Curated annotation (Swiss-Prot):
Specifically expressed in the developing myotome. Residues 29-75 are extracellular. The chain crosses the membrane at residues 6-28. Residues 1-5 are cytoplasmic. It comes from Danio rerio. A motif (AxLyCxL) lies at residues 58-67. GO terms for cellular component: plasma membrane. Belongs to the MYMX family. The AxLyCxL motif is required for myoblast fusion. It comes from the Eukaryota. The lineage of its organism: Eukaryota, Metazoa, Chordata, Craniata, Vertebrata. This is Protein myomixer. Myoblast-specific protein that mediates myoblast fusion, an essential step for the formation of multi-nucleated muscle fibers. Involved in membrane fusion downstream of the lipid mixing step mediated by mymk. Acts by generating membrane stresses via its extracellular C-terminus, leading to drive fusion pore formation.
Length: 75
């Protein structure tokens, strides 16, 4: 009999653990989507305030450099 209870307990723990993990993933996805939207809006507003073409080109150059560095680390 105790073996049956241990089996049931492990099944219940797995069930609740998987549901909790799924809920956590959904919450994280919603938070990241919202944060990305806000960040995009902020960056767009900053970009519109920059009037100098040279400044915009310098910023884009820095962003491309950072992206290339990140790509090299992944490989």
């Amino acid at each position: 009999m105790p073996a049956v209870f241990l089996l049931l307990r492990s099944l219940v723990v797995r069930l609740f653990g998987s549901r909790l993990a799924a809920s956590g993933v959904q919450l994280l996805r919603r938070i990241l989507t919202t944060a990305t939207g806000h960040l995009g809006t902020v960056l767009r507003n900053i970009w519109e305030r920059i009037s100098s073409q040279q400044s915009k080109e310098a910023i884009l150059g820095c962003v491309l450099c950072l992206l290339n560095m990140h790509k090299k680390v992944d490989n």
